[in-house]
A protein has these predicted regions:
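Heptad-repeat positions
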Residues: 28, 35, 42, 49-52, ...
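N-terminal secretory/targeting leader peptides
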Residues: 8-15, 47-50, 54, 58-158, ...
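Intrinsically disordered and other compositionally biased segments
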Residues: 7, 17, 32, 43-45
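Bacterial lipoprotein signal-peptidase II cleavage site
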Residues: 21-29
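Divalent-metal coordination cores built from histidine and acidic residues
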Residues: 170
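Generic low-complexity segments that are intrinsically disordered, proline-rich and/or Lys/Arg-biased
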Residues: 33-35, 151
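N-terminal export signals
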Residues: 1-21
Length: 399
């Protein structure tokens, strides 16, 4: 029986019913009923198939498509601390998204040079960079506040500013002017002043010193007569060994150990005035960020938040161990900077902040907001954690 058969059969049957016996008529009517019933079932099946096809089409339309995410970094591949952290973050995004965001990670120099990563992402050639935003101070000095600045915030204080005191909104504003969206993705805590091939006993010893030191701290050193240089991590060692620079800051004992600076500089100075904390940046192309669903954005934010905490915690766990290695295994001389030199650092820093404020309305807005938040959160830290730590270390003879 085929659909339509009932109608055709009905016409033919009507023409012959008059000549049929009662039993034949009954049989014909029975067949007509069966044919009509079959036709109804076929129609029902067709409707069910159509409904199933429509639902399948709707389901296919809402299945998220996989997105490729090219990430460029300013750190060397497999470099302990910073480099490994960046690779871990890239892998974590893919893992948390269950493969919907597939990352391709390129370390410094593998796709573009370290300092070219900003333009690579802003142009849309890559989707994200992992870097320290103070590298982009030449584009706008306000970027420095979203890594770290002289006499600025510790990582704990900076986190509070970014998350709960309006810092992220300012970061969005300055990044947005360059087609970017940035999130915190790492931190190393308070840094050492750095590695020097001569002793530093006063501010006069900084005059003529060629030092790798980026960000606003470089401007401070310039005011004290030094010659600041901004170099990506992968180029520092060769410049220190060759004598092209006399000193360098980097991070802290854990990260510095693997750079082997001890082969070219004998003195390891602390404390650093230049990088008290802050964080690193996962800078994304803003247009690409806008194409992500809320779920995909949440995945990226969660991965960045996780790595931001992990990198900081790893540094705190390992700095003491690797400081001992530097001293005991490589004969590094740990030196404390004289108190007087901080007065010179402070005066020069105040001048740099004023120059930064004068750069533009946005630079003034960021600087003023940062300093107001610093006074508030820093004041509390002084009463609480700093005061406690000083007494604890004295009582327990920790330092």
């Amino acid at each position: 029986l085929v659909k339509g058969g009932a109608a055709g059969a009905g016409v033919a049957t009507l023409a012959t019913l008059a000549g049929c016996s009662d039993s034949d008529k009954a049989e014909i009517e029975k067949l007509q009923q069966q044919l009509a019933s079959a036709n109804n079932k076929i129609s029902g099946l067709e409707n069910s198939v159509a409904d199933a096809e429509a639902k399948a089409s709707e389901a296919a339309a809402v299945v998220p498509q996989k997105k490729e995410m090219v990430i460029v970094s300013t750190w060397p591949r497999d470099f302990p601390g910073l480099g490994v952290s960046a690779q871990r973050l890239a892998a974590r995004i893919t893992e948390l998204s269950e493969g919907r965001l597939t990352t391709q990670y390129f370390a410094a120099g593998e796709r573009v040079g370290a300092f070219d990563s900003f333009d690579e992402v802003a142009s849309g050639n890559a989707q994200a960079y992992i870097a320290a935003d103070y590298y982009w101070k030449g584009k706008h000095p306000g970027f420095a506040f979203f890594t770290t600045v002289p006499f600025g915030m510790t990582t704990v204080e900076w986190n509070a500013w970014i998350k709960f005191m309006g810092g992220q909104e300012l970061w969005d504003e300055i990044s947005g002017e360059y087609g970017l969206k940035a999130l915190p993705c790492g931190a190393t805590g308070t840094q050492m002043m750095g590695w020097f091939n001569k002793e530093i006993e006063s501010a006069d010893d900084l005059k003529g010193l060629k030092m790798r030191i980026p960000g606003l701290a470089g401007d401070v050193m310039a005011k004290l007569g030094a010659s600041p240089v901004s170099l990506p991590g992968g180029q520092i060692y060769e410049n220190l060994v060759s004598g092209a620079i006399d000193a360098t800051e980097w991070v802290g004992p854990y990260n510095d150990y693997f750079m082997k600076f001890y082969e070219a500089a004998k003195y390891y100075y602390y404390p650093g005035f230049h990088e008290p904390g802050g964080g690193l940046s996962f800078g994304m192309n803003a247009s690409w960020w806008g194409t992500l669903s809320n779920w995909e954005k949440a995945v990226v934010e969660a991965a960045c938040m996780e790595e931001h905490a992990a990198q900081y915690e790893e540094a705190q766990a390992k700095n003491g161990e690797y400081l001992a290695k530097l001293i005991n295994e490589h004969g590094v001389e740990l030196r404390q900077l004289p108190e007087e030199i901080f007065e010179s650092f402070g005066k020069a820093t105040a001048e740099v902040y004023e120059e930064t404020r004068a750069h533009s309305p946005l630079a003034k807005k960021i600087t003023d907001h940062f300093m107001a938040a610093l006074r508030e959160v820093g004041g509390w830290q002084g009463i609480a954690e700093v005061a406690f730590s000083n007494h604890r270390n004295r009582i327990l003879d920790i330092v």
